[in-house]
Swiss-Prot record:
GO cellular component: cytoplasm
Role: Catalyzes the methyl esterification of L-isoaspartyl residues in peptides and proteins that result from spontaneous decomposition of normal L-aspartyl and L-asparaginyl residues. It plays a role in the repair and/or degradation of damaged proteins.
GO molecular function: protein-L-isoaspartate (D-aspartate) O-methyltransferase activity
Protein name stated in the entry: Protein-L-isoaspartate O-methyltransferase
Family according to the record: Belongs to the methyltransferase superfamily. L-isoaspartyl/D-aspartyl protein methyltransferase family.
């Protein structure tokens, strides 16, 4: 069955995201614009706008639209913000952040995903996104500090390297907790050198792999 991507996208935003309390207009508008079906495997395109995470290969997933919206809203993105993303995946979250006006620096550790995301984002003319193939738990120090940092995989703790690369003031959003996709979504703020963390609730992500991950 063929889907109408635009209609499905608008329905996704209204029924799965806005209806569940996400109110940031910048987030909602960005997710209305980004064609999620372009970031999933062809065989799963009919499910691209469903309320679920989907496999993208290499044991990784594209996050559920609602959790993408929640994390994006927590970041409080303003135009021109430098945002570090750990875990490019297929590139969907990076595209949403770019549509919100951010300059995105995204790190991916899996070569195949890095190559495919780089090509897709370039073809879609997201020139405000830079990608790097590396251990994301180490951040991207050459371009630090970052106004915002988002981690799209769950680790055992908040990597100190990422805290060090966070601007002051700055916001970091990261899933933290046990392996096997059971974590707590943590909101980390840095203000006048002081670090505060707030538990925003349960979540389920693939494992954060790297020197400061699993």
């Amino acid at each position: 069955m063929r889907i109408d991507p635009k209609r499905s996208r608008l329905k996704m935003v209204e029924e799965q995201i806005a209806a569940r309390g996400v109110a940031d207009k910048n987030v909602l508008d960005a997710m209305r614009r980004v064609p999620r079906h372009m970031f999933v495997q062809d065989a799963l395109a009919s499910r691209a706008y469903s309320d679920s995470a989907l496999p993208i290969g290499e044991g990784q997933t594209i996050s559920q639209p609602y959790i993408v919206a929640v994390m994006s809203e927590l970041l409080q993105i303003e135009s021109g913000h430098k945002v570090l993303e750990i875990g490019t995946g297929s590139g969907y979250q990076a595209a949403v952040l770019a549509e919100m006006g951010a300059d995105v620096f995204s790190v991916e550790r899996i070569r195949k995903l890095f190559i495919s995301a780089r090509k897709l984002l370039f073809d879609m003319r997201y020139f405000n996104i830079q990608l790097k193939l590396d251990d994301g738990t180490m951040g991207w120090p050459e371009n630090a500090p970052y106004d915002r940092i988002i981690v799209t995989a769950g680790g055992p703790e908040i990597p100190q390297y990422l805290i060090d690369q966070l601007a002051d003031p700055g916001i970091l959003v990261i899933p933290v907790g046990g392996q096997r996709r059971v974590q707590r979504l943590m909101l980390v703020t840095k203000t006048d050198g002081k670090i505060e963390t707030t538990d925003m609730g349960g979540c389920a992500f693939v494992d954060l792999v790297g020197k400061q991950g699993w």
